[in-house]
């Protein structure tokens, strides 16, 4: 796993702390993480796609965590925490197999709209990659995907050393009533 140059490291922010955890979401963050996961379905650039908002609650998070563990995988999460409120305002997740796999998959990254502009996306992704390197040093590649219109996340991925290797198109058809 090639990590970014030291100059690419984001600087700390006085307003936010970064918390990392593996597999199980801390109980105190469950409701907050459910709200963030709901916003993941509506607050990201969707390229004109129409999607239904997802419903997340603490039970769904725990069920998802159990399903991932049962499949022999682990979830690494980094969350941005507002120091003043103690509230989770951003998160990112990585998944990898627990069997020594050399691959990991970057999944969600979300910063609440009202907390953007503090480099939280970069900070949480970097913290999670650091966590991955510590806990799973055998991982050599991280696969991620991104919408072309999400220029902010594409820029973050560039800063972190990701390289485009393929393209995927999504099509949606609207049926008339």
Residue positions per predicted region:
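A conserved beta-strand-loop-helix scaffold within acyl/acetyltransferase catalytic domains
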Residues: 41-103, 107-113
